[in-house]
Amino acid sequence: MTKVKICGLRSLADVEKVNRYLPDYIGFVFADSRRFVTDEQALEMNRALDRRIQAVGVFVDEPLGHVAGLCDRGVINAVQLHGGESESYIRELKQNTGTTVIKAVRVQRAEQVSRMISQEADYMLFDTYKKGAPGGTGERFPLEIVKESFVRKPYFLAGGLDCGNVAEVIRQTECFAVDVSTGVETDGVKDEEKIRRFVECVRNVKRV
């Protein structure tokens, strides 16, 4: 079954909403974003998070020591990297913490995919390319990019997903997980009904 990640939680109210519907992962954004949270805010939310849900920290070119510290303190269970982090950065992070690493890339063309795959990361995440934006654009990812590519590593798909399109995205690709943020918000706030519907839509999909 395709996994679900709800990204960009910012409050205990958001945690209460996801706890009711149990996505597989949630995301705390530590990068410059309207969804940014501090270390202490993330720790407080993680303490309230259902233990069946994995907390992922989202970073853009963050000093390795800070990321490793959040892993060691139990603030996050996995790391998602959206910057230009090198293979040696990922290798050292994994050696120091034993954490799962998701490497996000923004792809414009199918021929770019093979050379952008990280050998060190556990998973890839493909997101919509938008100049100057490392992620979280809410714009639809062009599925032909992954459909035309041979991706050996399990991957997350992000970019413009919502309950209206996620089932077709899953059927058309071999994604390991789908990642949503804007698609489960109303006026910039996580919407419980949209979260419920999104999780339900994903878990009702039957791949051929």
Where are the predicted features?
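Conserved N-terminal beta1-alpha1 strand-loop-helix module at the mouth
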Residues: 1-208
